[in-house]
A protein has these predicted regions:
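Heptad-repeat positions
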Residues: 216, 223, 230, 237-240
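S-adenosyl-L-methionine-dependent methyltransferase catalytic module, highlighting the catalytic core
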Residues: 59-62, 66, 72, 76-210
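Conserved SAM-binding loop
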Residues: 2-89, 124, 166-170
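Short, Lys/Arg-enriched, disordered terminal segments
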Residues: 1, 240-241
Length: 241
């Protein structure tokens, strides 16, 4: 089974949809922090596109732990969130402070609690959490759907890339009891995630290098590869004229 989490009105072909709001008419009505309707290891792919930032911390950790629970070993998880690192750079150097701050806090949601942003992530933060939950083979993913994971938002007359899209494969169960970790995070939400994990496990996250720059290098490689393919096709079209 494949599930598109936090579906709103989007219904991708081949996916069941899940949303907290019955008004969105999803296949499954549920809170992504608690999905008892879905059996352990019953899913082959999950997409959570611009969902996690709408949860408070550490509820977002609890949601990712639930995703790990329902995914089978070898299953694929695709997450997209606003890229805090890029947004902070926009505040510092690109002259778009109101736009960037609005993206961070989810301006436009108004009084709709579920559409407001309550937390944010960098690639490093997501990689730490996903590694603990048993994921690896991290990569970038692209979405053709009409939603935030396609990577672009309009800022005036320009398209701005602000979406952090991470794909990961579940390799094993979490390193220890995720409910215990959730309670520890809840009791001290400002504590560094890696320190809490180091206290409860054999410091696997702290010992292993998880490279955020490597992830971005893969993005750049794919961009260069795509540009080369476009140039190749353009040359063929010129020759055919």
């Amino acid at each position: 089974m494949k599930i598109y989490l936090g579906s709103r009105n989007i219904k991708p072909e081949g996916f069941k949809t899940l949303d907290i709001s019955p008004a969105c008419n999803p296949d499954i009505v549920a809170d992504i922090t608690q999905m008892p309707q879905i059996q352990d290891g019953s899913c082959s792919e999950l997409i959570a596109s611009h969902v996690l930032e709408h949860l408070c911390w550490p509820d977002s950790f609890k949601a990712m732990a639930e995703m790990a629970r329902i995914l089978k070993v070898g299953g694929v998880l695709k997450i997209a969130v606003p890229d805090l690192r890029i947004l902070l750079e926009m505040i510092k150097s690109q002259g778009l402070p109101f736009y960037a701050v609005g993206m961070i806090f989810g301006q436009g949601a108004g009084s709709d609690f579920h559409n407001q942003h309550h937390y944010g992530f960098t690639a490093e933060m997501l990689l730490q959490i996903l590694k603990f939950l048993g994921f690896s083979d991290f990569d970038w993913w692209n979405s053709a759907l009409p939603e935030g994971a396609n990577g672009w938002y309009w800022a005036g007359q320009e398209k701005i890339a602000v979406s952090l899209n991470i794909k990961a494969v579940k390799k094993r169960p979490p390193s220890c009891d995720t409910e215990k970790i959730f309670e520890l995070l809840k009791s001290n939400p400002l504590q560094e995630f890696s320190r809490i994990i180091a206290m409860e496990t054999s410091s696997e996250i702290a010992d292993e290098q998880i490279s955020e720059p490597l992830l971005y290098q893969r993005i750049h490689f794919k961009l260069i590869d795509a540009m080369q393919r476009i140039a190749y096709l353009e040359n063929i079209l010129k020759e055919q004229k």
